[in-house]
UniProtKB/Swiss-Prot annotation:
Reactions catalysed according to its record: N(2)-succinyl-L-arginine + 2 H2O + 2 H(+) = N(2)-succinyl-L-ornithine + 2 NH4(+) + CO2
EC number: 3.5.3.23
Biological or metabolic pathway of the protein: Amino-acid degradation; L-arginine degradation via AST pathway; L-glutamate and succinate from L-arginine: step 2/5
Family annotation (PANTHER family): N-SUCCINYLARGININE DIHYDROLASE
Family: Belongs to the succinylarginine dihydrolase family.
HAMAP family (alphabetical): AstB
Disulfide bond residue pairs: none
Pfam families, per the entry: AstB
Record protein name field: N-succinylarginine dihydrolase
Amino acid sequence: MIVSEVNFDGLIGPTHNYAGLSRGNVASALHAGQPSYPRQAALQGLEKMKHLMDMGLTQGVFLPPLRPVTHLLHHLGYKGDDKTILKQAAKDDRLLFNNLCSASSMWAANAATVISEFDSHDGRVHFITANLATMLHRHLEAQTTYAQLNQIFSNSCFFAMHHPLPCGQHFSDEGAANHMRITSAHGRTGINIFVYGEKNDIYPARQKLRASQAVARLGEVKPDLAWFIPQKKEAIAKGAFHNDVVAVANEYVLLAHAEAFEDQGEWIKRIAEKIDGFIPIIIDNITLEQAVKSYLFNSQIVTLKDRTMALILPQEVKSDPAVWETVNRIISGNNPIKKAVVVDVRESMANGGGPACLRLRVPLSKAALEAVDQRFILTPKRWEKLYQLVENFWPEKITPDDLVLPELWKTAVRAHWALTSWLG
């Protein structure tokens, strides 16, 4: 059975902006109020996808939902057509309105937690849609994300789809950004590491233990394969609002900051006892602040056809000499990571999302991949058409003040229908 990992990247939507909605996200706060460049943002994301395609990897795409959201306003008692209620909401409650316009669905790592068929009791790939309950602008994505996942992975012989957990911070779940799978190979049984946050006095911990436990139950993870590890409080306090800001794993390799987890040494020892050939790469020569600013650990590690691995990094790693030296030490070290690919995702980075944030990892057998809706799998031809579509329909530049302009809403609708046509 041939099993590979397919990355599904979120296409960045036409209302991409810097409204500073995400408490605990250092980059979001730093760039709040600045102009954004939605067209450039989406093209940067597409170029990253093309890099992986050119490396011989299968690449999928998630399409952005229509923004601004209007259904919530109807639930809140607004009356009239979409244009009328959006105008009124923008006048009444600007913060609420800004939440309705967010393009944060681009960060597909928060779409769901994915459980491999080799780790689930029923032998299917399980998708547990994240409720994203901590932040309103993220929570508004949950139901449309579930619908899109259900469309792409509709074959119940191979896939099991789960609704988001009940809303409320008791069950706050932010998806694969707080989940790592460590295994000797994608096609073998592995440990599912669920990283959760404990109470923090500075920033909210977005992943609750009881949520992670529920996700493991829903995904039918075999009990001995579900491990629950607390994220280090200092990491959250320094701006690591998801585990994937301080750690990333691929097959039997773990790349992590030395202060990523509580009792880290003990957990590393336990993983080594469970997984043959486990290689931990623990970085202790840069600070948590450097890790958060550079997003070194928000990289993608991918397995290439020759069984070596590549590190897909944001270009910001080159801005800090100590971080860039660390990258070079990694790829020259005694581990399978032999290639560093630097990509430009500056527009996403300015809102707190690096290469790893932009993708959802889905391990698929050859048969399961064939059962996926192929319209969401990119080929060179479909990628080119999507690239041209973005160039034609995405606005070049917007500011947070532009979000209230009806012309921008019309632009977003036109882009949405163009994507619908592209999908076919």
